[in-house]
Amino acid sequence: MIFTKSLINPFVHLSAIPTQRIYKTLNDIGLEVDSFHSLRAPDRVVVGKVLECEKHPDADKLNVCQVDIGEERRQIVCGAKNVAAGQWVAVALEGAKISDTLTIKKAKLRGIESQGMICSSSELGFPKLNEGIMILDSSIGELKLGKPLHEYPLFSDDIFEIDITPNRGDCLSLYGVARELAAAYDLDFSEYPKEQEEDNVLGIGRLLQVSHEGKLDSSLLYKTVQLNELKLPLSIALTLAYNDLLGESVLQNFIQYATLVSGVSIKAYRHDACLPASTSDEKPLKASIMIKKDENGLESVYAGEKKLSTIGVSQNRETMPLDAPEVVILEASYTPPAIISEGVARSKVEKETRFFYRASRGSNPHLPSGITLLCSALHKMGGALIYSGTHEITQNYKPATITVDLHSLSAFIGQEVPKTKVVSLLKSLKFEVDLASDDSFLAIRPPLFRHDIHNKQDIAEEIVRLLGIDTILAKPLYFAEKRRTDEEYILYKHHRSLAKRAMVAGFNETIHFVFNQKSRLKEWGYTTIDESVDLLNPITSELDTLRPTLLLSLLDSVVRNKNLGYSQIALFEMGSTYTAARQERFSLAFVASGLKKEAIYPYPKGEKWSLFGFAEEIASVIGEFSLEQRAPQSEKLFHPAQCAYIIQKGERIGTIAKLHPLAQEAFDLEETFVAEIDLEALKPSLIQAQSFSKFPKLQRDLTVLIGKNHPFSALRQEIKKLGIIEIKELFPLDIYTDEKIDEEQISLTIRLLIQSDSKTLEEEEIVSITQKVLDLLNHRFGAKLR
């Protein structure tokens, strides 16, 4: 946006403030100045009046003008098409330096002497207004013959071009910029112009009826005006030209000017275009307008079935007034910018920049200010007749109240700001401020035109803007890192700890897709995801469902490594698996295939994996566990005779098994062992310190004949039920059979580790303990001491 110091002065008096200071202030308050320069009409350019204008006798495109410059008359040859007698013009006299390359001198043009030059605005360094000379009028001030042009404020000015961020639509107007500067300098801001006194006794109700359908988000104000022959004042033309808004239509230029100054979005409709259809020869006098939502859900203006405009977005060009005497309907509108932006983005309708740009960033919601300014300009400068009254559709917009405590506000800012100063600064920006009963809290309501204020951080930013960032004392940043160890972090660290232990145990980590092939899973006996919740659009047919197990992918990786020539293959993976109902679980799986130790001394043939050796390595990762015999269910990967549940803390947390011979053959692998564990059961826990006994630990071995179908886990469970605290551990030591032992029995040696926490056990006490165990085994399992 481009403005000049003289354009701002009517709203806030900046005459006494140096231009360089204004430049710095604009940057300080967030209205970044893109460019800044002073523009002054050259010396020896004065106000003149064309008294006579005749065609040059020897040139079709030249005119010979007699120009009065006050003390004398000058003859000037001019080639402008629009020059005519009676015009007030800018005259460059002899010696005037118009540019670095042009100095005015007496000259003869086609034999006729010319004593100066009648100038256009662009020739004097100002924006281009038309194709001819610049015609002066009283809008720049009282015209006096011979008065230097640079003595008029409009032609000796300071030009600012500022960059307005998208959230500061309130500063897309002269009112907005003036309001900001008034707050920064603690100056009075001139309110909106007084309402124009209507001079037409006919009220708006005789010419226009306005209605609406349903609940609206927009506020609208309508006014009717009788236009006469319009003429655009020079001051308005120059103001618009600075911002590249000057167009061909005089009325549209007046509207653009009112919008630029006030920030109110304004449209004009031909009254004739809004009249209802008539079946008689008599033309109706009363136009009818309906506001309702269109097919895209955007609030629009209709006259009957004809759409006049979409509020804040576009206008039907057929409804735009011509620069001719007629009755015109003026419309000022406001819609909250978020509603406009979301509606246009959703419907993808075509938009006109001159409406949408301002509406989507936030136009001025005080509609009377724009309409009053426009009507005043049309009446005073264009001779228009203003009809009395208005039609208004007003919404009750209520800005949210933001509660801020002064301590937090000072913390945001970085230094203590007195309460009175905070209140004063906010009120200068037109905020409403209420103090709480304890004076430590402020209830703040931003003005409607500040749609960018939502929270206390925004309030702090407003205060810093006006205080000036340079006034905030610089000090070292103090911060203390907060403890960020939460459950998720602890779980993550636990999982990575398990992974590190697995790598120390010789397993390599792998990562696979969470997808697998449904037909292949069913082939190996796994329950797949129910069709109702399965993937609708799988990547490929080989990845058409979510995996219920990690083992198939791990076995595929084992095959790939074997084909690459590796003989020692030990892999693990942590990842998601899914139940039939598509509930996510987290699992940990291991696989070991081929040799455990390479074929080098002292293992010339290498060392093969065994189920117990595999279990021992897994125990080094997840901690000690016991095994409980498990018959394979639907899974076809597990060996029926070497398959067990993994028991930890009395709960089944997974399965360990040797690969079924048929599966081993199908995958073309050596002896392979697999395990899959519910990772959610391996919850992290703090190490619990426990006391230990200082007294000797003794071993006692019991060899019994017992039925071979009794699992050792059942024996262990029953012995623990005895509650003998001196038995610290028990485990199977040896199994023996020969022809002398019944084929339904085995010779089982159980080792007991016995220790007291309070004394050294006597032999009689040890014998008593072992006897209790023997009695239990005999009574519950029919075991006999061998």
Curated annotation (Swiss-Prot):
GO CC term, one of those recorded: phenylalanine-tRNA ligase complex
FDX-ACB domain location is 693-786
What SUPFAM superfamilies has UniProt attached to this entry?
Anticodon-binding domain of PheRS, Class II aaRS and biotin synthetases, Nucleic acid-binding proteins, Putative DNA-binding domain
Annotated B5 domain residues: 397-474
| Pfam family of the protein (one) | FDX-ACB
Catalysed reaction(s)?
tRNA(Phe) + L-phenylalanine + ATP = L-phenylalanyl-tRNA(Phe) + AMP + diphosphate + H(+)
tRNA-binding domain residues are 39-150
Where is this chain primarily localised?
A: cytoplasm
Q: Which cofactor does it need?
A: Mg(2+)
Query: Which one GO biological process term can you cite for this protein?
Result: phenylalanyl-tRNA aminoacylation
Report the subcellular localization.
Answer: Cytoplasm
Q: List the InterPro entries.
A: aa-tRNA-synth_II/BPL/LPL (IPR045864), DNA-bd_dom_put_sf (IPR009061), Fdx_antiC-bd (IPR005121), Fdx_antiC-bd_sf (IPR036690), NA-bd_OB-fold (IPR012340), Phe-tRNA-ligase_IIc_bsu (IPR045060), Phe-tRNA-ligase_IIc_bsu_bact (IPR004532), PheRS_beta_core (IPR041616)
Q: Name one GO molecular function term.
A: magnesium ion binding
Q: How is the cofactor bound?
A: Binds 2 magnesium ions per tetramer.
- Enzyme Commission numbers on file: 6.1.1.20
Alphabetized, the UniProt keywords read: Aminoacyl-tRNA synthetase, ATP-binding, Cytoplasm, Ligase, Magnesium, Metal-binding, Nucleotide-binding, Protein biosynthesis, RNA-binding, tRNA-binding
Q: Which HAMAP family match?
A: Phe_tRNA_synth_beta1
Q: Which PANTHER family match?
A: PHENYLALANINE--TRNA LIGASE BETA SUBUNIT (PTHR10947:SF0), PHENYLALANYL-TRNA SYNTHETASE BETA CHAIN AND LEUCINE-RICH REPEAT-CONTAINING PROTEIN 47 (PTHR10947)
> Family, per the entry?
Belongs to the phenylalanyl-tRNA synthetase beta subunit family. Type 1 subfamily.
Would you tell me the protein name for this molecule? Phenylalanine--tRNA ligase beta subunit
Q: Which organism is it from?
A: Wolinella succinogenes (strain ATCC 29543 / DSM 1740 / CCUG 13145 / JCM 31913 / LMG 7466 / NCTC 11488 / FDC 602W)
